[in-house]
């Protein structure tokens, strides 16, 4: 029994391939059941986002891995070898490490992003509802969620914005202080503007005004966020109401010029106005930045913020990798130990049965002529023989349990001695079956 992951992401597969193997939520139940019905696949969880599709599975037979690839190939109508060329596969400790890195945002396109942790949790909970999660995947995903939270808490890897839109809002917040109660004018209604509005609203701005050359598009974006749309030829009039102006159009010339801004600033009675120009080519004439009461940042200013923040995230990622190394090691040690316990108990029980049977047979053959002292000596000798015979294999098994392949040695011992551990050798977890962090594996309660 082992955990494996078969997946593809933005690094291994182009968008055309990722689209074919993207599983919308309404198909996930069918996908999970289809996978778990395949021979050798005991349980599974599927994570499907815009940048990755991953199947985490517990395999009871080696054929299970090939059957996962076959399933994916059938779903997208491609040959198995074509699918394999775009996927990666990790097993044993490396599959656990990969899951922990994914939940921590270290495997994401945007290093340290937070959305993936919620996506991992959602995928896990959905598979639980469908009934395709066994105790081993349960433990792995519970711990992955805990590790993802720990990494973010201890390293702050998600604290520094690395997108231009987020950096624009963060720069405004750092310069102006709280954004609550501020009026914002967005010039342009493209994707970047949409993302910027989302970030602004999360910081509690009072209102958003949207202006765009295509007025219907301005209306659409404003309606999406409960803002106000204004016509492009009224831009300067409405600029007088704004504390922050963020411009991102596709114009090939300056959209906001210095001369009209002089009148706008006069009407504002000395109130400062903060410009962020994230367009390329620039929307705001650099001369605007020299006007009294104006603070102007352009894309290069923002890029320096992004670069600095990305460097901070990379430094945090080094610390995150150390945390993950320790967490993987602890998880595998706890898991290996729990696998060994039923085998050790069964082996001792078998030794005790053999000792008792052979001792009874020997005493019957000797008759009732032995003194109490002689019986005690013979019984002690039998105990010592069994204890010494089992001591070395049990000691070595416990040490081997601390390796990623530990449970294989446990399986081998069960076969060699024809042992039948309780629950088939599957660890009995302490506490609630629906929750299984490492503390449960160690028998400390959940």
Swiss-Prot record:
Q: Report the pathway entry.
A: Porphyrin-containing compound metabolism; protoporphyrin-IX biosynthesis; 5-aminolevulinate from L-glutamyl-tRNA(Glu): step 1/2
- Which residue positions does UniProt flag as site: Important for activity? 98
In Pfam terms, one family for this protein is: Shikimate_DH
- List the catalytic activities from the record: (S)-4-amino-5-oxopentanoate + tRNA(Glu) + NADP(+) = L-glutamyl-tRNA(Glu) + NADPH + H(+)
* The keyword rRNA-binding is assigned to this record: no
State the UniProt keywords alphabetically: NADP, Oxidoreductase, Porphyrin biosynthesis
Mind listing the GO biological process terms from this record? Answer: protoporphyrinogen IX biosynthetic process from glutamate
Show the active-site residues. Answer: 50 (nucleophile)
What is the enzyme's main class? Answer: oxidoreductase
GO MF term list: glutamyl-tRNA reductase activity; NADP binding
Q: Which residues cross the membrane?
A: none
SUPFAM superfamilies xrefs:
Glutamyl tRNA-reductase catalytic, N-terminal domain, Glutamyl tRNA-reductase dimerization domain, NAD(P)-binding Rossmann-fold domains
Superkingdom per UniProt:
Bacteria
Can you tell me which residues bind NADP(+)?
A: 188-193
The EC code for this enzyme is 1.2.1.70
Where substrate binds, per the record, is at 49-52, 108, 113-115, 119
How would you summarize the oligomeric state and partners of this protein? Homodimer.
The record's comment on protein family reads: Belongs to the glutamyl-tRNA reductase family.
Domain comment, as recorded: Possesses an unusual extended V-shaped dimeric structure with each monomer consisting of three distinct domains arranged along a curved 'spinal' alpha-helix. The N-terminal catalytic domain specifically recognizes the glutamate moiety of the substrate. The second domain is the NADPH-binding domain, and the third C-terminal domain is responsible for dimerization.
Chain's role: Catalyzes the NADPH-dependent reduction of glutamyl-tRNA(Glu) to glutamate 1-semialdehyde (GSA).
Miscellaneous:
During catalysis, the active site Cys acts as a nucleophile attacking the alpha-carbonyl group of tRNA-bound glutamate with the formation of a thioester intermediate between enzyme and glutamate, and the concomitant release of tRNA(Glu). The thioester intermediate is finally reduced by direct hydride transfer from NADPH, to form the product GSA.
Protein name (database record)? Glutamyl-tRNA reductase
Organism for this UniProt entry: Desulforudis audaxviator (strain MP104C)
Q: What is the lineage of its organism?
A: Bacteria, Bacillati, Bacillota, Clostridia, Thermoanaerobacterales
